[in-house]
Structures are given as C-alpha cells and as structure tokens.
C-alpha cells in the first residue's frame, strides 16, 4: 500500500479532560509517552476514559465543548492539527459509517486526504480484502450486521495507512474466529506500516502477542500501571483485577445455580425466517426454538448468521417473513398462542425486556434516571413503585453516580449497563439481550452474570445473543448455534 505515514509519537503531560455538564473529570493528570512504532494495549475499568483518551489523541474533541488541562501532543502538534497522521476505529462502528455503499465508505477518507484518484480504488479493494469483507464495493452499508460494520470500518481505517493506529474494541462485535482473523490483520498492518498502535480491548490475552506494552488508566485519574505485559500482570495483576481490569486467563467465577421453580414455555418460534426490505437473501435461515422460564439460552454463531435478527423476532419487535413466533400462556395469561409481533408496545414493555445491539438506539430521554422511569410509566406502574425500581437498578448496575447524566454521554460499557437496567425496569418475565457484555470490565461483567443468573433462578427466561464464549459458559443452560447467511 503506497502513501505510508511515518510512525507517530504521543506525549501527555498532566493532561486531563472534563465533559460538558459533568463535575468529575473523565481523566486527570495523565502522564504518558508512547514512542514511534510502539504497540500499546490500553486497559482500565468501565468508564475509566479509554475511549475518551483515544478520541482526544485522534483530535476529534471540540476544544470549545470540553474542558482540558495540561498538554497532549501527537508528533509535537495539538492532536487536531495532526489528524492526518492518525486513523481511529470507533467503539461503535456504525457511528463512523457515513456512506451508502461499502466501497464509497473506504474511499471517503482517502478522498478527504487528497489521495490521487487513480490510486484510490486499488487501496479500497486491498483494504476490503485484508479484513475479509464478505461483499463487494456496492454492498449497502445499512444492510450490514454489527460485525460486518466493524470489518468495514477497520478497512476504511487501514486504507489510510496512518502513522498512528487507534483501535477502540476492534473485535467486540465479532465471533471468536473472526476476531482472531482481525487481530492477525492488525498485526500484519502495523508490521507493514511501521505504525504506532494503541488498542483498547477486553480480550486481553489474545492481544499480547501483538503489543509490547500495557498502559492502565483509572476513572478521573491518570496512568496507574505501565510496562511490558508479562511484568505488569505479574506485579499488579491481583490489584488490577480487583478494580475491574481484565487479566489474562483469570475469568470471574460463574454464579452457582439455585433451586429452580418448574419451567414453563414463554415463547415458541417455529421455522422462522426473516428478510429485510430490498434484500435478496434471508438474514435468518429457517430456525425453531422455544424459550422457557428458569432457563438461559445463548444464541451464538458467526458474524452475519442472524443472531440479532432472531433476538428481535423473539422479542416481538420484528414480524417473521415465514414461520411463527407465538406467546405461551405463561408469558401473559389469556394471550397464549397469539403472535408476539401483534402485541402493543405497552404489552411488550410489561412482559418482554429487550437490549439492542446498539444501546443508544433505545435511549429516549435526557437523563439516566428518566430512562429507567420511562418503561415502568409506559407499563402503567405507579410513580412511587417506578422510582423504587429505578433506584435499585441504579445501585445494582453501578450507575447511581450517573443518574443525572445524559445517556448519550456515557461510555460504551455504561450505556450497555443502562440498557440492561432499562430492560429490567418493568420486571418482565422474558429478557432478550443482544451482546450485553460489550464494553464491560471484569467486575461489571461478573456482576452482570450474577444478576442474570439470579433472575433466571427466580423464574425468568433469559435469551442472549453473544460472541462472548466465557459469558455463554457462565450463564447459558442451552445454546442455539446459527449458521452463515442462507
């Protein structure tokens, strides 16, 4: 790939940042030097400011919209003046996809950087091939799954051949096999480019062969640990694990099963398929599954196999193209054998709690507390009871300190916990969750497993679409494996 940039250096001295409307600093007194060509894994608890730091290094913060202190430089320049030196993959890939077709998305950044027209499409094709993008240039971006969006966004980033590669959870939406492929692609890319690499990931062990340094930050503070991976984890592993940092080969303990009440069938899906409008192929091939109380079911499979689509069908939010999804009598008395997609929004809110793959798509209010009150109010709960539930969930999911914050200003992990809390606010009998562990640190991951296990043991049904094998093993009683696209 031509037009390579020299590896970039990062220097932070006493640097800090505070978001609008927040009393607490997201980061403060950050002292950090990353030399050209170094490969650093950036770790920290959920909400520690990892994404904020990457975005700042990329020069994407509006100086008029945030408060900063100290110095942050990329190759001796303010980050906003060095934007052409870096390439950033966002935590939410959909938020950076702006073009209608895949090829145009990859070409967009190259055009903005004035790459000669006769060189653009060769670089586009090479980048798409490098990430094993499963479609051609003309694939509509709106038709991509979350994992396919992640591949496309990475292709667009790599096509720039940046001197500084900033990756925020680059494999979070990918199945384990695809994640391994992408790690290999990134390793080969930084070898070829000689680029400086800073990556945020919770799959720590898998990235250790690629990085030569680990940097750990804390919420509201700065760097608390920094060094070669083996040395750092040997000296600080136990302490870091206690604060929520993921440590290689040390998963949190799974919850023990309690005594279960008798199982009842809540939802039955028979031979269901779904095809999105204007598509020529089914997003979900014919699938049958039943969801029962006191049971957790994991939906797993490769990227693009239809996990998110099946989750929406089971939650009553999509109507099948073929087949049926019907409610059991145990889900709502008097509504047994009715198509779930025919229920009103209020009925669904009372009986089915849903967490989307992109949690910000379900936020409708201006504060975390109001978001938790919305569902109970729609379901007809009295205000005092709704307030009690909201307060309990704020504490249980470590969101109490963010009660007045705007949901759209939360970190990815905090947004995911808020979406889980919102799904639980109406005390539904059925929970359908899409990638609920995205962005969670070791501590909040374990707490989420224990919370969902307790709900299952209390007689609820839990259905999760997930790429997280550890989460599947810790929670699921039954696993449904989906294949590739039909």
Task: Specify the residue positions occupied by each region the protein language model found.
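ABC ATPase C-loop
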Residues: 158, 423-424
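Conserved catalytic motifs of ABC-family nucleotide-binding domains
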Residues: 161, 427
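Catalytic Walker B motif of ABC-type/P-loop ATPase nucleotide-binding domains
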Residues: 165-169, 431-435
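Conserved beta-strand-loop-alpha-helix hinge in the C-terminal portion
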Residues: 221-244, 483-486
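Helix-to-loop junction immediately C-terminal to a conserved catalytic motif
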Residues: 58, 315
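Conserved ABC ATPase signature
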Residues: 140-144, 148, 406-410, 414
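ABC ATPase NBD Q-loop/coupling interface
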Residues: 18, 61, 71-82, 324-347
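Conserved ABC ATPase "signature" region
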Residues: 119-136, 384-402
């Amino acid at each position: 790939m031509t037009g390579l940039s020299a590896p970039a250096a990062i220097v932070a001295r006493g640097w800090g940042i505070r978001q609008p409307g927040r009393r607490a600093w997201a980061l403060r007194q950050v002292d950090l030097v990353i030399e050209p060509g170094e490969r650093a894994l950036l770790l920290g608890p959920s909400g520690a400011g990892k994404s904020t730091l990457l975005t700042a290094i990329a020069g994407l913060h509006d100086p008029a919209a945030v408060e900063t202190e100290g110095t942050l430089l990329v190759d001796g320049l303010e980050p906003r003046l060095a934007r052409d030196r870096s390439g950033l993959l966002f935590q939410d890939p959909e938020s950076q996809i702006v073009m209608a077709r895949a090829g145009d998305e990859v070409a967009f950044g190259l055009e903005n950087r004035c790459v000669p027209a006769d060189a653009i499409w060769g670089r586009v094709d090479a980048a798409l091939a490098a990430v094993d993008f499963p479609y051609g240039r003309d694939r509509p971006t709106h038709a991509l799954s979350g994992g396919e969006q992640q591949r496309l966004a990475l292709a667009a980033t790599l096509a720039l051949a940046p001197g500084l590669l900033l990756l925020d959870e680059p494999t979070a939406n990918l199945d384990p096999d695809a994640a391994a492929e992408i790690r290999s692609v990134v390793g080969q890319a930084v070898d070829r480019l000689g680029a400086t690499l800073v990556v945020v990931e919770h799959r720590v062990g898998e990235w250790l062969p690629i990085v030569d340094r680990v940097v750990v930050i804390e919420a509201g503070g700065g760097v608390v640990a920094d060094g070669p991976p083996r040395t750092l984890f040997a000296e600080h592993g136990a302490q870091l694990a206690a604060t929520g940092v993921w440590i290689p080969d040390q998963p949190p303990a799974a919850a023990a099963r309690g005594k279960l009440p008798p199982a009842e069938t809540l939802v039955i899906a028979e031979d269901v398929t779904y095809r999105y409008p204007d598509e020529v192929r089914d997003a979900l091939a014919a699938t049958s599954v039943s969801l029962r109380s006191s049971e957790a079911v994991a939906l797993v499979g490769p990227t693009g196999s239809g996990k998110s689509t099946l989750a929406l069908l089971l939650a009553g939010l999509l109507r099948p193209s073929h087949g049926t999804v019907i409610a059991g009598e145990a889900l709502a008395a008097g509504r047994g054998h009715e198509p779930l997609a025919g229920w009103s929004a209020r009925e669904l809110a009372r009986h089915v709690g849903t967490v989307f793959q992109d949690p910000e798509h379900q936020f409708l209010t201006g504060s975390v507390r109001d978001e938790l009150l919305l569902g109970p109010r729609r379901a007809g709960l009295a205000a005092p009871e709704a307030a009690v539930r909201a307060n309990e969930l704020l504490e249980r999911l470590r969101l109490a300190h963010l009660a007045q914050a705007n949901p759209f200003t939360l970190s990815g992990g905090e947004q995911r916990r808020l979406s889980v809390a919102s799904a639980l606010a109406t005390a539904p009998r059925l929970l359908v969750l899409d990638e609920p562990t995205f962005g969670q640190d070791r501590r909040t991951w374990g707490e989420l497993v224990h919370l969902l296990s307790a709900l299952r043991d209390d007689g609820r049904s839990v259905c999760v679409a997930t790429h997280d094998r550890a989460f599947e093993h810790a929670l699921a009683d039954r696993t449904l494996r989906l294949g590739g696209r039909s």
